[in-house]
Amino acid sequence: MKRSAFFISDGTGITAETLGQSLLAQFENITFAKFTRPYIDSVDKARAMVQQINLAAEKDGFRPIIFDTIVNQDIREILATSNGFMIDIFSTFLAPLEQELSEHSSYSVGKSHSIGHNSNYMERIEAVNFALDNDDGARTHYYDKADLILVGVSRCGKTPTCLYMAMQFGIRAANYPLTEDDMEHLTLPAALRAHSHKLFGLTIDPDRLTAIRNERKPNSRYSSYAQCEFEVREVENLFRRENIAHINSTHFSVEEISAKILVEKGVERRFK
């Protein structure tokens, strides 16, 4: 079965999309065609949106699922005339919160993502810059300022994990690729020894690593199964020998990997 799903907002759409994606992921037997529609902030845009939803309903033979975070009541009422199943995120959660807190909501558009109301903005930018500056072992003399240092073979997911933790939580994460030379010495590189308490290892199944590396350097020694299997085996041995906590990234999303790392290392998010 295939259904259409719309994430509609009068702001960036991040909240509607994030919550909507999480809910739809629980229905593994249904394929969803997903459409994010940010900045639906006028009556005219809302009417055009209704036309899109109705066209999708006619094409699919099922009414689309709509997740919205629209603040304006007039716009919400227009969207409600569409041939879609509407889940109004704000009205679902704000009313009981207002009752519990004995306080009326401000009903402000884009409140959670605006720079002016987000004291975490600069923290996020600094963390992203740190992750980029300290990517792939390019620099090691700022490791004293790192919250975490991810280590593992090349192409096992270190960079996207560092960037995700920087963007989402303000974590200053560096990463260092362990090479064949490092494995031959049977010990941590000198640049990492002084920061062993910050290290967390990522490993990966050799066949998955082979597929990833073949996209970058096909038919090379670097991407051969034998080389990938050797590197993964030796790095896992190093992790055990040096007592470095680690996880296999093969079957986890970057979100899951990041959450597991923070729990395992006990690192507090700079913002939540």
Swiss-Prot record:
GO terms for molecular function: ADP binding; ATP binding; phosphotransferase activity, phosphate group as acceptor; protein serine/threonine kinase activity. It catalyses: [pyruvate, water dikinase] + ADP = [pyruvate, water dikinase]-phosphate + AMP + H(+); [pyruvate, water dikinase]-phosphate + phosphate + H(+) = [pyruvate, water dikinase] + diphosphate. Its EC number is 2.7.11.33, 2.7.4.28. It is an enzyme of class 2 (transferase). Keywords: Kinase, Nucleotide-binding, Serine/threonine-protein kinase, Transferase. ADP binds at G152, V153, S154, R155, C156, G157, K158, T159. NCBIfam families: PRK05339.1. Belongs to the pyruvate, phosphate/water dikinase regulatory protein family. PSRP subfamily. This is Putative phosphoenolpyruvate synthase regulatory protein. It comes from Pseudomonas fluorescens (strain SBW25). The lineage of its organism: Bacteria, Pseudomonadati, Pseudomonadota, Gammaproteobacteria, Pseudomonadales.
